[in-house]
Amino acid sequence: QKLLPFFGNYIDNKGILIGNKNEGSVLKLTNDQLFSYPGYNEILTGFADDSIRSNDKIYNKNKTILELLNANKNYSGKVAAFCSWDVFPFIINDKRSGVPVSAGYSNLESKKLSKLESFIENYQTMIPLFRDNVRYDLFTHILSMEHIKNRTPKAVYISYDETDSFSHA
């Protein structure tokens, strides 16, 4: 609670966290690839796909939970994704699904950006980059929180990267 008040104050009341074995919520991936794209496909679709054998930017043929939600009349236009890694538009298949995905250093596709969103989009690439295809988690976090505050979506997927990337160093 003290270290991560957002989790304690917001997610505990309005969201869900999966993968806390102490709470009986165990998540176990079954794909045999043990790297990013196949793993995220499995997390977002609910099943492993043995045909996904790389992290290449290839549009996912599988429908994610985000796409299924966006196709539901109660969620249509109220689903979004904010991801640090620039491959997520392909994993989520933003073109087919209609789910807006802010990932990597791509700009938001909105004509009504807040001052903070415009600031982040203009300046996020002006600091030294640790990888050219991964946005710093701070920017992903700010953009996602600003979206939640201003657009009141019903479902938001947020994927940070630094704990993964920096653990490989």
Task: Show which residues each predicted segment covers.
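A short aromatic-anchored loop/beta-hairpin motif
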Residues: I18-N22, D32-G39, I43-D49
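Stable alpha-helical elements in mature extracytoplasmic
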Residues: L3-F7, S36-Y40, K61-L68, Y75, ...
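Loop/turn elements at helix/coil->beta-strand transitions in domains of secreted/extracellular proteins
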Residues: N13-N20, N72-V79, N150-V156
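Short, structured active-site-proximal loop/turn typified by the sulfatase FGly-forming signature C/S-X-P-X-R
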Residues: K2-Q33, A80
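Second-shell loop/turn segments in exported
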Residues: K28-N31, D50-K57, P128-V134, E146, ...
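Solvent-exposed loop/turn segments at secondary-structure junctions
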Residues: S25-K28, D49-D50, W85-F90, E162-F166
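Active-site His/acidic residue clusters
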Residues: D94-R96, I142-A169
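Catalytic-site neighborhoods of secreted/periplasmic enzymes
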Residues: F47-T125
